[in-house]
Structure formats: structure tokens, C-alpha cells
Amino acid sequence: MTEPRFGPAGNSESFAAAGFKKSEDAPAWLAQMGLTAFEYQCGRGVRCGEETALKIGAAAKQHGIRMSIHAPYFINLSSEESERMEKNVGYVLETARLAVPLGAVRMVVHCGGQGKLTRERAMRNSHENVRNILRALDENHLTGCTVCLETMGKK
């Protein structure tokens, strides 16, 4: 049986208060506290370079920290706009590319809100768009991460 892992999503205020500024220092800091997981946040866009991601990934491996990554928050899988969905697929692909040097095994993707759509229509769109994303990940050979859908906290 796999042991549960605990850790933060992103760097907390206590990380900065301890004098740290770089995410590559997070794995050692987390390990010192007995934590075993770290979710790299791309909530406002994928803004981490490959060199930095490699450093974070190497530090995570060295300290036994399991990595995950969070795709940008502005993704909305219930969208009916084809241009918007093309962008959403692009955001997920960017996130998946960054997951590789980070060594992330899971990629969290927000489903977004239903807006003025009925719940049924929003779910149908989301299912279709998730299939499109999975197809794009497969076509781009970016299948090393499990896609984890995260819902909003309403009804």
C-alpha cells in the first residue's frame, strides 16, 4: 500500500519568512518539516523556465518530495468557444511540458464554471474538451502525468 503524501500547493508565507525566495529551495525546506509532496503552481500562467524546473525536480528527487503541477486557473473546460478551447488545450500542453523537468506525476486542471450554461450542457462540453486535451497530450507524447480534474467549490 502506498503511503499518503502531504505538502503545500505553492510556496507559503512561512517559506518566505524562513528566508527562502527560490522554489528550488522548497523541497529541502519541506523535507525538513516532514512533508513529502509539493505542487508547483502555474495559476497565472506557465512562467517557469526549463533550467529552473530541472533544479526544482532534482531537489525534489534528492529530498524524496513527490511533485505535482497545477495548470493555469483561467482554463474553463465547459466553454463552447472553439478559440477559447484551443487556448485551453495550449495551456494544458505548456503545463505538461513543464511537468517533465519537474518530475511531476500529476497535473491538476480546474474545470472552470458553467456560467450561463445548464449543468448538463456544461458537463457535456467538459467531457468533450477533456477528451480533446487527452488526445492532444497523447499526440504530443506528453503522457507522463495523470490529469487530475479539480472542480469549483459550489453546489
Question: Language-model features: where?
Answer:
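N-terminal pre-domain/capping segments
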Residues: 1-71, 75-96
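Active-site acidic/histidine proton-transfer and metal-coordination neighborhood
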Residues: 61-62, 77-155
